[in-house]
Every structure is written in structure tokens, then in C-alpha cells.
């Protein structure tokens, strides 16, 4: 990376020269040395990069490591908590909310207040009580990032029917470490249940530790291809959500639906085209998968690509017709 002491030295040196007394003097020589925030962030990025890069080899390493990492940390905490007044509005899907503030965010009511599952932002809002003389209660919401969750991406894209609502029983196939599962747990609430099936043991361990704090999640570390292995743990469910990314995912979903899903129950499937067939275009893959679902008595209701959030992904929502599809 080319470094021009003049450019950085002048700008940072001049700006921060007033306090600390180092900016002006060392500006030209060390590249705006102790600028940044708190006297370190910018410093070692520009400073040592230019002056000490030649001998000792410290320039590049410290520039990338300290300058970059500390900059990122500032961004993470910002957003809704930055002193802005946040108003929570209910989304048209029950159990999902929108936080209106500096930016509009998709949020769910935290089932385990004070606990963050994957480092997501939390927003505390005072809700006035319905009785006179009772102080307002604090309610915590968790930001649901559509870039981290296919289900959130589908909701942002405008899914009409979700089948996941307060009090519902949901079978979640391909739960991984529980990023989306935790939000589904928030949506169904204490009256609902999420049966989270994951085959890999490493994410499975994280899923189990998360489920310890959320009594409505039942983690099942088992292969979703063999639903008979966990049939004694699950009753009939209202909805099957699948994010398994396997070539035979239509068959996996069908097996679980036939065994656990109520008649007229909902099926929500995230399809990743590359995982099923990377030799044809995504639209062809989606069409083939929808046809396979029809053959398994799942009536497709809508299909939605997750374009701004995920590439070559789509969500298909269907209804399970136990008696068969009418021709």
C-alpha cells in the first residue's frame, strides 16, 4: 500500500493538533501520528506505517490490526441506542415489530431480557402500564438482521403468510447455532414451542447452551433425513421451517411434514440454488424444487427471492394438504 505522509500528516496532524500537543509537531514526520480516537486509532495506522515501515517491519502490521479493528468497534454499538427516541410498532406478522428511530429496524421482543445471542443490538423501551399509578415497565427488543437470517430477509421482502406466530409450534430444520431460531423463539413466545433440529455437533453445542436460557426451544442434535429417530420428542406442529441447503432438501422436508405437520399446516423453505444444482440457473432450480413440493402434497402459496440480502436464494411458502392436492 503506497503511503503519502503529506496527505495524512496534514489532515490529521492539523485537526488534532490543538489538544495533546502532538498533532502539529509530528504531523509531517509521522503521518498524523496520534490522531484517530483516544490517541491511538489513527495513530498507528498512518503513523508507524510511514515512518517505521522501512526498518523493524512494524508499520503494516500495526496499521491494519489496530487502526482497522478499533474503527469497526465504534460502528457496532451505534444505531438505535444512540440517544435517539425509538418507537416500537407492531408488524403485520404477529410477534414481529418495527423499531422506528434514526433508521427503521426489524425487531422481536426478547424472551430472555439482558441476553444477546449472536452479538445483536438490543433496544430497551419503556411501555406505559394500563393501570393508573403503576410505573411503566421496561421491555427489551432484539434487532433481527436480514443479512444474518433468511427468515428476516423474507419478512423484509414482504412475505404474505408466515405461519409463525405467538403460541404456535414450529419445527425448525437446519437450526445451526440458533441465530434465527432465537428470533423464532421470541415470535412464538412462552406459549409456543420451537423444535430445533441440527445435525452438526459444533453448532449444536451453541444451540443447546442458547436453549438453556430459552425454555420454549427444544434442541435436537439429529439428522433431519431420519425423522423417526426423534419422533418421540415432537408432537404435531403448526409449521415446518427448513434451511438445510442439501440437494435432497425437498425429500427431507416432505418426510418431516408427513410425520409431524398438521393438515393445512404451513411450510416455509429457504432454497439455496447452488447447493441443489450449480450447473443450471437459479430460476430453473427453484421451479424444480416447487414441483417436487407439489408431488409431496405441499401446495405452494408464494415464492420470493432474497435479492438484496442473499444471492441466488429464495423462500417458498406452502400449505401442507394431507388429503392431497386438488387437480
From Swiss-Prot:
Signal peptide: none annotated. Belongs to the methyltransferase superfamily. Fibrillarin family. Residues 22-42, 58-75 are annotated as: RNA-binding RGG-box. This is rRNA 2'-O-methyltransferase fibrillarin. It catalyses: L-glutaminyl-[histone H2A] + S-adenosyl-L-methionine = N(5)-methyl-L-glutaminyl-[histone H2A] + S-adenosyl-L-homocysteine + H(+); a ribonucleotide in rRNA + S-adenosyl-L-methionine = a 2'-O-methylribonucleotide in rRNA + S-adenosyl-L-homocysteine + H(+). Component of box C/D small nucleolar ribonucleoprotein (snoRNP) particles that contain SNU13, NOP1, SIK1/NOP56 and NOP58, plus a guide RNA. Interacts with snoRNA U3. Interacts with MPP10, NOP58, SIK1 and SOF1. Component of the ribosomal small subunit (SSU) processome composed of at least 40 protein subunits and snoRNA U3. Changing residue 103 to G: In nop1.3; thermosensitive allele showing a decrease in histone-glutamine N-methyltransferase activity upon shift to restrictive temperature. Residues 8-83 are annotated as: RGG-box. Methylated by HMT1, forming asymmetric dimethylarginines (DMA) within a domain referred to as an RGG box, made up of repeated Gly-Gly dipeptides interspersed with Arg and aromatic residues. Residues 179-180, 198-199, 223-224, 243-246 are annotated as: S-adenosyl-L-methionine binding.
Amino acid at each position: 500500500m503506497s503511503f503519502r505522509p503529506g496527505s495524512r500528516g496534514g489532515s490529521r496532524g492539523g485537526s488534532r493538533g490543538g489538544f495533546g500537543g502532538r498533532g502539529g509537531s509530528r504531523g509531517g514526520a509521522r503521518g498524523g501520528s496520534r490522531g484517530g480516537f483516544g490517541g491511538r486509532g489513527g495513530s498507528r495506522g498512518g503513523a508507524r506505517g510511514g515512518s517505521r515501515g522501512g526498518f523493524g517491519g512494524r508499520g503494516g502490521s500495526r496499521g491494519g490490526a489496530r487502526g482497522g479493528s478499533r474503527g469497526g468497534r465504534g460502528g457496532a454499538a451505534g444505531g438505535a441506542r444512540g440517544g435517539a427516541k425509538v418507537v416500537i410498532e407492531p408488524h403485520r406478522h404477529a410477534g414481529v415489530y418495527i423499531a422506528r428511530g434514526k433508521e427503521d429496524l426489524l425487531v422481536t421482543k426478547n424472551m430472555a431480557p439482558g441476553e444477546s445471542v449472536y452479538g445483536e443490538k438490543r433496544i430497551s423501551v419503556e411501555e406505559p402500564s394500563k393501570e393508573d399509578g403503576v410505573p411503566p415497565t421496561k421491555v427489551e427488543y432484539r434487532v433481527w438482521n436480514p443479512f444474518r437470517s433468511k427468515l428476516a430477509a423474507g419478512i423484509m421482502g414482504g412475505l404474505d403468510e408466515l405461519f409463525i406466530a405467538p403460541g404456535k409450534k414450529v419445527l425448525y430444520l437446519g437450526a445451526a447455532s440458533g441465530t434465527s431460531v432465537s428470533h423464532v423463539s421470541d415470535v412464538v413466545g412462552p406459549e409456543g414451542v420451537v423444535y430445533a433440529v441440527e445435525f452438526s455437533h459444533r453448532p449444536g453445542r451453541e444451540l443447546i447452551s442458547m436453549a438453556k436460557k430459552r425454555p420454549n426451544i427444544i434442541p435436537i442434535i439429529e439428522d433431519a433425513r431420519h425423522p423417526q429417530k426423534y419422533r418421540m420428542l415432537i408432537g404435531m406442529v403448526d409449521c415446518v421451517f427448513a434451511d438445510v441447503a442439501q440437494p435432497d432438501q425437498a425429500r427431507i422436508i416432505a418426510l418431516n411434514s408427513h410425520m409431524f405437520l398438521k393438515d393445512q399446516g404451513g411450510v416455509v423453505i429457504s432454497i439455496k440454488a447452488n447447493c441443489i444444482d450449480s450447473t443450471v440457473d437459479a430460476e430453473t432450480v427453484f421451479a424444480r424444487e416447487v414441483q417436487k413440493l407439489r408431488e409431496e402434497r405441499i401446495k405452494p402459496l408464494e415464492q420470493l427471492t432474497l435479492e438484496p440480502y442473499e444471492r441466488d436464494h429464495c423462500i417458498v411458502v406452502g400449505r401442507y394438504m394431507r388429503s392431497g392436492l386438488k387437480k
